[in-house]
C-alpha cells in the first residue's frame, strides 16, 4: 500500500506516466492475487513454474489494510478512477468489521481471523512507519468526505477523542495521528464543476 501511495503521489507531482503505471500495476496485483473472499492476505509467493499461480496466505494485519486503503485513495485522487475508491471502501469496511474495538475505540492490530493470540494489541505509536491506527483513522476521515459516510467519520472521531491526551502529552510519538487530527479539525473544500 505504501508503494502504491508513493507512486500515485509521485505521478501527481511529477506527471511521470511510469509512476502511475507502477501504482496501478501494484494495486491491480494486490487486488487480484492477495484478496480472497473479501479478506486481504499478508504474503504472496510466486512460483517458478509459470503454469501455476502464486500462493497468498496469512491473514493481513491492521497496517496492511490501512496502508493499502490509503494507497488506493491516493491512486483514486491521481486518476479519479472509481474502481480505486470502491476498492478502498471495500477494504475499509472489512477493516472496521474485523479490527475495530467496540469497547474503547481504535483498531486492534490483529483481526478475529488470527488464531491462538494471548492478547490483541492496539498500537498507536508512529515511528519510522506510521501506525495502523493512525493510517486507518486518516483513511476513515478521507472516505467519510469522499463518500459522505457518517459512520466512518464517527469512528475516526472516536479514535481522535480517545487519544487526545496522549497526543497532547507526547506529540512526537503520534505524528501521523496528528495529521489525521489536522484533517479532522480543518474543513475540506468541495468544488462542483457543472457544464
Whereabouts are the PLM-identified features?
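Glycan-recognition and catalytic cores of secretory/periplasmic carbohydrate-active enzymes
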Residues: 1-195
